[in-house]
Each structure stands twice: as C-alpha cells, then as structure tokens.
C-alpha cells in the first residue's frame, strides 16, 4: 500500500521514528477499554432526528488506482473514428464498475471515484492517459472480496489496476456496545444503532482492547467542509453519554 508519492506506511513510520528516536516511551500496559465520541460525518442521524448513535462497527474498504492508456493526438486534426481517447475509455468503465458495486451491495453501495489525473491535460490534445481512484466500502468481507475479484473485468484490456489500500470491516466489542446503549438511555434521549463508513482511531484500537464508539449528528450530513456543524445541544448529549460510559468502565474490576 503506497501513497501518492510512492511511500509505504512502513517507510513513513520508520522515517518518523528516526526523527523522534530520543523521546521517552511510556510503559506498555494493558488497556481496559477504548471509547470514542465523534460526529457521524453522514446524514443518517440528522435525517432520523436522533441525537445519539451507538456504533456497531466500521465498514471495510478497498482503494484502487486505474490507469487507462490511449494515444495523445491533435484535437483538431484527428478524425473521431481514428482516436483512442483515454478519458473516454475511463468513463466507459465507470458504468460497469458502478453496476458491479450495485449488484454486490445494493442499497449499501458506497462507491466513489474521487481522484482524477488526465495527461497531457491540454485543451487541444486528446487524452493519452487517464488515471482515477476507486473507493469501495462495505461491512461484509465477502462483498469486498467479490468486488476485488471482478473489478478487472470492468476495465479496458490494457488498463493498469493497482491496489492502494485494504482494510477489513471492524466489529466493535459487544459488552462495550451494551454499556454505551445504557449510557444513551441514561441521558433520556433517543438513540439508534449505526455503522460507521469512515475511518476512526477506534478502527485501529479495536485490535488491542475492547472498543466502541458514539456518534452525534452532522447537520445535512456534511463533513470535510467548512459547513460542517453539530448542534451544541447534541454535542452536550454526546459528552454526557461519554462521561457516563467512562465512569461505568472505571468502576469495572
């Protein structure tokens, strides 16, 4: 798994550790539990008018990069039937990829083509190469695997498919989930079970200790945007449920 600069997570961590090699490290001790409070970053709670969400887990994800090859040529002198436009080849594959995701995931489809690069990116030149990313998420590892196995058949024959990142679905601890449900009940407010589609610290902590999460609504489902907003009363409700749950965890033997 490499980033846009071709650097792996391991390489980045090694470089980071070298910069701070002299910092003291805390003693490694067992962690009793981890609870994370976060905005939903989606519209589900807000549309349901529910102030609190107890998160059951986090969807798994597959990231890919697809590079479609064409032939750069003059935009005004090359007849249509003699062109090999890489961008058109890429766009034709989008419908097939979307149909695959729809068939496998139905209403739970989470498919995004978020990053594009077209070369030579000139107004008077046919695209010789078009590169785009695929972000596919689902809670069922079998669906993720099926998408992975069938994806290449959706692409042009000479397209280059690269896997960028993969993470299995995360299931949170049932006992911590039950404790958070009790915490929400203690606030006197309505709540519902919800699954996270975004990555959170809890996704990584779940492999080390019992873990779960609380969500509060995001107005209009907007996140990663200056318009991101959660009502202060809902923030208060989330903080109250978090405090209740932490006290309950602290009192456990």
Regions found by a protein language model. Give the residues of each.
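Short secondary-structure junctions
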Residues: 103-111, 156-159, 184-190
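Short, low-order "capping/linker" segments at domain edges
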Residues: 169-187, 212
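Predominant activation on well-ordered alpha-helical scaffold segments within soluble catalytic domains
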Residues: 10, 14, 65, 87-98, ...
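Short beta-alpha connecting loops at secondary-structure transitions
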Residues: 137-141, 164-168, 221-232
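Short amphipathic alpha-helices in soluble, non-transmembrane regions
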Residues: 146-155
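A short beta-alpha structural unit
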Residues: 112-121, 132-139, 159-177, 203
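Zn-dependent metallopeptidase/amidohydrolase metal-coordination segment
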Residues: 191-244, 249
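Midchain, well-structured core segments that form catalytic/ion-binding scaffolds
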Residues: 1-142
């Amino acid at each position: 798994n490499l980033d846009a600069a071709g650097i792996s997570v391991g390489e980045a961590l090694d470089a980071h550790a070298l910069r701070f090699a002299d910092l003291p490290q805390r003693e490694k001790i067992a962690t009793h539990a981890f609870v994370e409070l976060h905005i939903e970053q989606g519209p589900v709670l807000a549309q349901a008018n529910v102030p609190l969400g107890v998160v059951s887990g986090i969807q798994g994800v597959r990231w890919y990069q697809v590079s479609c090859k064409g032939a750069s040529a003059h935009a005004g002198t090359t007849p249509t039937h003699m062109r090999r436009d890489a961008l058109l080849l890429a766009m034709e594959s989008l419908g097939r990829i979307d149909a695959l995701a729809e068939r496998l995931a139905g209403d739970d489809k989470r498919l995004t083509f978020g990053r594009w690069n077209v070369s030579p990116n000139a107004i008077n030149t046919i695209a010789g190469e078009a590169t785009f990313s695929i972000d596919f998420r689902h809670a069922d590892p079998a669906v993720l695997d099926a998408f992975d196995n069938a994806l290449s058949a959706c692409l042009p024959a000479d397209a280059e498919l690269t896997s960028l990142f993969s993470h299995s679905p995360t299931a949170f601890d049932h006992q911590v989930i039950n404790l958070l449900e009790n915490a929400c009940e203690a606030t006197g407010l309505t709540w519902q079970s919800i699954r996270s589609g975004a990555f959170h610290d809890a996704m990584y902590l779940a492999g080390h200790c019992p873990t779960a999460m609380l969500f509060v609504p995001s107005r209009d489902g907007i996140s990663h945007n200056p318009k991101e907003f959660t009502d202060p009363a809902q923030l208060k409700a989330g903080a109250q449920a978090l405090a209740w749950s932490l006290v309950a965890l602290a009192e456990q033997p």
